[in-house]
Regions:
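Sec-exported extracytoplasmic/periplasmic mature domains
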Residues: 53-61, 154-158
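Bacterial N-terminal signal peptides that target proteins for export
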Residues: 2-14
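Extracytosolic low-complexity repeat regions of secreted or lipid-anchored proteins
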Residues: 91, 95-163
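Short, solvent-exposed recognition patches
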Residues: 59-114
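Extracytoplasmic
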Residues: 43, 79-83, 125-129
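Post-signal peptide N-terminal segment of mature Sec-exported envelope proteins
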Residues: 35-57
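Bacterial signal peptide processing site
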Residues: 26-30
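C-terminal motif of bacterial Sec signal peptides marking the signal peptidase cleavage site
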Residues: 21-25
């Protein structure tokens, strides 16, 4: 995907920002969010562990509440949870010349609208793919979660093309 050849759309106001597939919802036993843990290679795992180390304690004014199962490759904030997964596969949508992209504080993101009206964001032009999903209930804050995460992504995941 050539990020700069794609349309850019700024996401503000009430658009939904959640990933239907990645965020499995809440467990009835402990009300914790769950997320599928990626299985990247050793190099990407090392980058993701560094990202986990530098992630903010708050995103969109929500305290960190990591999803189950616990992993250095996933993180969460709030309830319903904003979910981050590091080391995900390259989304096939990156091959689409009509794909939408956004930029938040120097980090490019692929924007994918889901069937339920939610969105999935995946970093572009980084050595590892980082995916962020924001629940529909938090859509009113626009790109605030991506802005909050940008510094950590820039610090831990170098620019370049993921293998």
């Amino acid at each position: 995907m050539n990020f700069f050849r794609h349309r850019r759309r700024t996401v503000f106001g009430p658009p939904a920002l959640a990933l239907l597939i990645t965020v499995a919802g809440c467990s009835s036993a402990d009300d914790s969010a769950s997320a599928v843990v990626p299985s990247p290679g050793a190099g990407v795992t090392k980058l993701c562990r560094e990202l986990d180390r530098v992630l903010p304690s708050k995103v969109d004014d929500q305290d960190r509440r990591d999803p189950e199962p616990a992993s250095a490759l996933t993180a969460g904030w709030g309830d319903p949870a904003i979910i981050l997964r590091c080391g995900v596969e390259r989304p096939s949508k990156m091959d689409d010349p009509e794909a939408d992209g956004v930029e938040a504080n120097g980090v490019g993101w692929l924007l994918e609208e889901q069937d339920d009206g939610s969105f999935r964001f995946t970093t572009t032009l980084r050595k590892a793919y980082v995916e962020v999903t924001i629940p529909k209930d938090r859509a009113g804050d626009g790109m605030a979660p991506l802005v909050d995460l940008a510094s950590a992504v820039k610090k831990a995941i170098p620019e370049g093309i993921a293998d």
